[in-house]
Swiss-Prot record:
Binding residue positions for Mg(2+): 122, 148
Residues binding substrate, per UniProt: 70, 122
TM segment ranges: none
Subunit structure: Homodimer or homotrimer.
Record-linked Gene3D superfamilies: Phosphoenolpyruvate-binding domains
Keywords tagged on the record: Hydrolase, Magnesium, Metal-binding
Keyword Glycoprotein: no
Family: Belongs to the HpcH/HpaI aldolase family.
Coiled coil stretches, renumbered: none
Entry protein name: (3S)-malyl-CoA thioesterase
């Protein structure tokens, strides 16, 4: 897992055309916000949304929430103008839709020389080219677009997301190999807390840093599931203490709760504590 100074447990989509939603987002408990100019905005509102969002980012206070702008694709009539408008905006990253190959990032990189780039991974071709995409020097994060991927695959929804597993796994491997942040796709039934929790647990078990969300009601569950639990923090501290004690006696392994603890487990334990500290710092900011 990449070390992160900022948590990405909850990444909330906000339509760039909705002034009330943009205002409300300033007080929500989201680690990051995706200000959406693409799927969430009707064609006849695209220009209005671009102007509204640019003004909002210049004047509104989103605190320490990570601000990501999802632009329209370069193959649309709005994509280039979006990039030109937000190249120097008060944002933390630009999210590019439907990235299928590393070349899709090149034109964007030239137009946005200073901001980190994130990629929407939502096409079958993108899954197959995940390693190539993740290796791009300007890329900082990946966002799984599971709705579009399901459409391409022609798959039916299953709670275990069986049809998604190969693509999710390829992107996770690529992201981890290149030290990128990677967040899971959305859960559409925003009133189904049990289903959301189960899918968040699955995503965390797989190794995602957090989950993209479509409704503020989903924030609490995502934040809880993707945070280290008190038990995990306590275990990490005990593992580190036991391993350091073993090292003082010239031993390379320790035993905690009847299980062998080696250096690789200590790396994970320290990452757990670092994530807990980052979350605590974010809450205090």
């Amino acid at each position: 897992m990449a070390h992160q100074a900022h948590p990405f447990r909850s990444v909330l989509y906000i339509p760039g055309s909705k002034e009330r939603a943009l205002e409300k987002a300033q007080g929500l408990a989201a680690d990051a916000i995706i200000f959406d100019l693409e799927d969430a905005v009707a064609h006849d509102e695209k220009i209005h949304a671009r102007r509204l969002l640019k003004t909002t980012l210049e004047t509104a206070d989103y605190g320490h929430r990570f601000r990501i702008v999802r632009v329209n694709g370069m193959d649309t009539e709005w994509g280039r103008a979006d990039l030109e408008a937000f190249a120097e905006a008060k944002a933390d990253a630009i999210l590019i839709p439907k990235v299928s190959r590393a070349a899709d990032l090149e034109a964007v990189a030239a137009l946005v020389p200073d901001l980190p780039l994130w990629a929407m991974m939502e096409t079958a071709q993108g899954m197959l080219n995940a390693a190539e995409i993740a290796a791009h020097p300007r890329l900082s994060g990946m966002v799984m677009g599971t709705n579009d991927l399901a459409k391409e695959l022609g798959s039916r929804y299953r709670p275990d997301r069986l049809a998604m597993q190969a693509g999710l796994g390829l992107c996770l491997l690529a992201a981890r190999a290149h030290g990128l942040t990677i967040v899971d796709g959305v859960y559409n039934a925003f009133k189904d807390e049990e289903g959301l929790r189960a899918e968040c647990e699955q995503g965390r078990d797989m190794g995602f840093d957090g989950k993209t969300l479509i409704h503020p009601a989903q924030l609490e569950i995502a934040n809880a599931v993707f945070s280290p639990s008190p038990a995990e923090i306590e275990l990490a501290n005990r593992q580190i203490a036991a391993f350091e004690e073993a090292e003082r006696h010239g031993q390379g392994v320790a035993v905690v709760d009847g299980k062998i603890v080696e250096n690789l487990h200590i790396v994970t334990a320290r990452q757990t504590l670092a994530k807990a500290e980052a979350i605590a710092a974010f809450r205090a900011s």
